[in-house]
Curated annotation (Swiss-Prot):
Pfam families: ABC_tran (PF00005). InterPro entries: AAA+_ATPase, ABC_transporter-like_ATP-bd, ABC_transporter-like_CS, P-loop_NTPase, PstB-like. The complex is composed of two ATP-binding proteins (PstB), two transmembrane proteins (PstC and PstA) and a solute-binding protein (PstS). The gene is pstB. This is Phosphate import ATP-binding protein PstB. One of its GO terms (cellular component) is plasma membrane. Residues 29-270 form the ABC transporter domain. SMART domains: AAA.
Amino acid sequence: MTEISITTSVPDAGAPPSVVGGQVERAKVSVRDLNFYYGDNHALKAINLNLIANRVTAFIGPSGCGKSTLLRVFNRMYDLYPGQRATGQVMLDSQNVLDAKLDLNLLRARVGMVFQKPTPFPMTIYENIAFGVRLYEKISKSEMDNRVERALRGGALWNEVKDQLGASGLSLSGGQQQRLCIARTIAVRPEVILFDEPCSALDPISTAKIEELIDELKEDYTIAIVTHNMQQAARVSDSTAFMYLGELIEFGETNKIFTSPTDRRTQDYITGRFG
């Protein structure tokens, strides 16, 4: 892995992927000169970074610094709210996420999201998984059964619920509900998964399961996670971005960010001097 200092520019889309340690590293998402506004409030300021395919990128920083806002730009969740707008480019492979003509339903299938609190639908465990699949595909009952099982296995939940698929998703524990939401997300076969503080409402045991799952999921998906837990960021991520007041202050390999940051503000935040 290479060490990356704060990113001031992003390679052209046509640039060849880098080769590190014999492995090809490819940007799945390239953010270029991204600015975001809540009305007149300039919430994100000239953000430039790459999310490398099949790696976990953690976003850290104090509350209100723009971490969750940035995640919501990646799949255009901000479109649900009036008065919010983004400028610049967010390239998902060769497609600009900010293109006004983009099909948002298809975008959100490609870029899934898991929220801070578990959000299971008020329906059975089986239907929680099948619901999203039906929005995009018409498949047979046997194919759906297989898809549900694969998704629940991918969410590390199958062995716990395989005999109660007809039970309500709301009957599960908090940790199980969050893994159900992860399974629901991967059921539609996304390419990128966004985690917005996925463990903040969970106990330590459930948190450990989610972190282990994230490590497994990066084999198949590109992952971005927002967290206020410094230890969690250090444990689960390959790269870390520190944000402050809407700016990307420093971005690099997680080990370097936590052991030898180049910006004093990063060091002060990591060591608890503010935040």
